[in-house]
A protein has these predicted regions:
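Conserved active-site and SAM-binding loop architecture
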Residues: 1-212
């Protein structure tokens, strides 16, 4: 029996571990959009999943001007430094002999990366949304500051809620959701309570909910 192709929005996409898992299960899929601001992760994603090579970077003929590439990458907060709380300076490559701008701009284009999730007004419909939100503030190796809306990086989880609520209004909810994160999310009592509440919210707006 032939498996039907599904469309995917991969949020906090990193290097594409979620779409790799989907494909390893033998499920054909089409990536509608990704969302990440780690420029090196986007570069890796495009290399692993989208056919980005040095040869392609050198032979691609449809680049906009360097000023425009720098503007576009800055606009989506690609490379934003959270420790220094400042955007990446893409404009420093405008007059460079290197092809840094071309490399990252093309990686961003091929991976269909929308950049900073907090800047997105809505997401186009996809059957499946995956979201591996930052574990910085909940993992044992992290700051343990918790999932606080608008205050911590792990609080970016609430951007998914915002986009789902918008999708609900647009009658464009996904059929499936997959959240991936560290085990402690279900171990600490505060996190456990929060995540049970999250599942309750998801049950209100989506079709298929499960915990693995």
């Amino acid at each position: 029996m032939k498996t039907e192709k599904i469309t995917v929005n991969e949020l906090f996409s990193g290097i594409g571990a979620q779409v790799s898992a989907i494909r390893r299960l033998g499920i054909p899929c089409e990536i509608k959009h990704t969302s990440d601001i780690d420029h090196n992760a986007v570069l890796a994603y495009a290399s692993i999943h989208c056919g980005l090579t040095e040869e392609l970077i050198n032979t691609y003929t449809e680049y906009p001007t360097r000023e425009e590439m720098a503007r576009q990458l800055t606009e989506i907060n690609l490379g934003y430094d959270f420790q220094k709380n400042k955007p990446y300076n893409w404009y420093r490559f405008v007059n460079s002999k290197s092809k840094e701008l071309e490399k990252y701009w093309l990686a961003n284009k091929l991976s269909r990366n929308l950049g900073d999730i907090s800047k997105l007004e809505h997401l186009d419909y996809a059957d499946f949304w995956t979201y591996s939100f930052p574990c910085t503030d909940i993992s044992v190796a992290g700051k343990q500051e918790g999932i606080k809306q608008g205050q911590t990086r792990s609080g970016l989880l609430y951007e998914v809620q915002r986009l789902l609520e918008k999708a609900n209004k647009m009658l464009a909810l996904p059929k499936y959701l997959m959240l991936e994160n560290v085990k402690i999310l279900w171990v600490k009592s505060l996190n456990h309570s929060l995540m049970n509440g999250w599942l309750g919210l998801m049950n209100l707006v989506t079709i298929h909910i499960g915990k693995f």
